[in-house]
Amino acid sequence: GGKSNTVESKVQETAAEETMTVDKDKKEIVMLCEVNGTYFTEPTRHGIVYKGGSNGEKAVLRGLADEKEFYQALLDIGAKAGDNLTAADMKAGPDNGKSVEGDKLDVFVKWDGQDEIPFRDIIKCTEDYTMDLRFGGNIESAKENNTGCVLCLDSCATGIVSDAAWPTGTTQNDIAKFYGDKDVLPEDGTQVTVVFRLAK
C-alpha cells in the first residue's frame, strides 16, 4: 500500500538530514564524516569526499553527505560560487597554476571529546601554509564526473570547495604533499563533524 512508501521515504529523508544540516540564519552547514586512516601515511589531495563518489576512499575524511546536495546547501546559506577553473587548468605545471575563486569559508572539525578546531589543524603538509578555502562551485563537473569531492586540499575544477592557497598543479607537481595528521585526528573509522561557515 501507499502508506509504507511514505514511511520509507520519511526514514530516508531523516537519514539524509542527519548526515548534513543547514542553518541559514547562522550561515553554516554541518556534515558528518569518518576518518580514513590510510592517509595518515599516504599523501592525498582530497580533504573530504562523499563515500558514494568514485573518490570516496581517497580522502582524509569520508563524507557521509552527497557533494551535490552540499553544493545546494552552500547556495542556500548565501554563498557565491567562483566557477573559474576548467579541466585544462588542472593540467598546470609547477608555476602556471590558477587559484580557485568564490566566497571564503571557515571550516572546522570536532568530535567526541574534542571541541571545534580549524580544518587546517587536521592536515599535515610538507610545506607550511595558511588555508584559504573557497566555494569553487563546479556543479557541472561534479555531475559529470561523480567523484564525490566535497573539499580539495589544492585548487580544483571538480571539488565543491577547494583551497586557493595552493594553485592547480600543486599536488601533481609534488610542490606540497598533504596527509591527515594522526597526532590530531582520532583513529580510523571514527565519526567526526565538519562545520562550514560563510566567512564574514
Language model region names:
Residues 1-15:
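Bacterial Sec-dependent signal peptides at the C-terminal "C-region" and cleavage site
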